[in-house]
């Protein structure tokens, strides 16, 4: 096993003349839940897309289990990915969507039922995806991310569209995954919710402002992740 589940080393990404992220470096330990935080336009989605090979960095590299995403023999076994804004084919059922994902991942036939149960969609498996609420679609995205039984999850705004019960469910889901030895890198604006579940945080605003343990950032009961986050991002110029 490589030392880190995820490692980002000096990643810079430009889109033409626009600098999206600048010399980002951080590592995500095995068995941890790490929150990736930053204001809109800070480069969170760019960073996640670079890690999973959807974007090529201008310089630097990103590794999963010590290798670039493109070098993983069967990526779905190593990492499950759920990105905000990635849609589904609305005319097919949830089960069919997961069957397609299962075939692509080379997962056993029974895996679809397992992930449907894990995300609470068993009773809705035969519904067409276009009838799903935003929260149900989020759960379906998580189910697809789990289909290959990966050791690592990379999630972009998984709480979007979830009601309070759904957010509580998501918190439990992430904890259970980590307790089984899994690793999670999650980008979210839900700071209060993240504070209850993450072990470490990475705050970026095109570059890394903080990367480390939550307890090293929030050092007293009088502080919160939200207050320390705003101290960091409002104290920088871009």
PLM segments and residue spans:
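Helix-to-loop junction immediately C-terminal to a conserved catalytic motif
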Residues: 52
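Conserved ABC transporter NBD signature motif
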Residues: 60-75
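Conserved ABC ATPase "signature" region
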Residues: 99, 103, 109-124
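Catalytic Walker B motif of ABC-type/P-loop ATPase nucleotide-binding domains
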Residues: 153-157
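Helical segment within the ABC ATPase nucleotide-binding domain
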Residues: 167-180
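H-loop (His-switch) and adjacent beta-strand-loop-beta switch element
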Residues: 201-213
